[in-house]
Amino acid sequence: MLVIPAIDLIGGEVVRLEKGDFARKTVYARDPAEKAAELVRDGASLIHVVDLDGAKAGWPVNLDAVRAICAVPGAEVELGGGLRSLPDIEKVLELGVRYVVLGTAAVERLDLVRQACARFPGRVRSGIDARNGEVKIAGWLEGTGLGAAEVARRVKEAGVGLVEYTDVGRDGMFTGVDAEGAARLQAEAGVQVVASGGVAGLDDVRACRAAGLAGVIVGKALYEGRIALAEAVRAAAE
């Protein structure tokens, strides 16, 4: 199972939001590439990068920071946030991004997901963000009335092989990851699932591994020193 550290970007800086609230932001690093290099040294084989400005705007914003992260030796990058057109997807893949994570597009533009999967096979993932069971889009700012399993089934049919599921209500709150919900989603939709949101310690990593998930994304717990990446990588491999 993969442990995937997260780098969230606003204004070219590494930040974390509390419950996805843009008004509750903490800046953790001014240099994203330096942070990425540190994560690679600690054992990261994949880094989850989110362009939060892009998620809000609807197109990629932090391209300079993304380019710098991709240039770090040993850094394999997946990028989400504002990827809602084929030219934008192509642009970030050309920067060196390995996988794109489509969130809003997975709900509003299933045709785009299909086209992207056909054009860039194996490089398109879907981010499904839910609060109280309802899928949220546009940087978690808009509700959809849809459930996570329904969206996961749709993107699987469109060609997506892996879904990253975030419980928005837990994100940045250290309340424990929803490994059970992620495993249920994996079983119901028949697609590989990576869990995200609420990771508080190594027990969450072990819970995700025990649930048979493809991976777990670790963000704030890493930046607040509640979890060491090297230890988490070891726990995932136990």
UniProtKB/Swiss-Prot annotation:
GO terms for molecular function: 1-(5-phosphoribosyl)-5-[(5-phosphoribosylamino)methylideneamino]imidazole-4-carboxamide isomerase activity. GO terms for biological process: L-histidine biosynthetic process; L-tryptophan biosynthetic process. Pfam families: His_biosynth (PF00977). It catalyses: 1-(5-phospho-beta-D-ribosyl)-5-[(5-phospho-beta-D-ribosylamino)methylideneamino]imidazole-4-carboxamide = 5-[(5-phospho-1-deoxy-D-ribulos-1-ylimino)methylamino]-1-(5-phospho-beta-D-ribosyl)imidazole-4-carboxamide. Coiled coil: none annotated. Keywords: Amino-acid biosynthesis, Cytoplasm, Histidine biosynthesis, Isomerase. This is 1-(5-phosphoribosyl)-5-[(5-phosphoribosylamino)methylideneamino] imidazole-4-carboxamide isomerase. Its main location: cytoplasm. It is found in: Cytoplasm. It comes from Anaeromyxobacter sp. (strain K). CDD domains: HisA. Belongs to the HisA/HisF family. Pathway: Amino-acid biosynthesis; L-histidine biosynthesis; L-histidine from 5-phospho-alpha-D-ribose 1-diphosphate: step 4/9. Its EC number is 5.3.1.16. GO terms for cellular component: cytoplasm. The active site is at D8 (proton acceptor), D129 (proton donor).
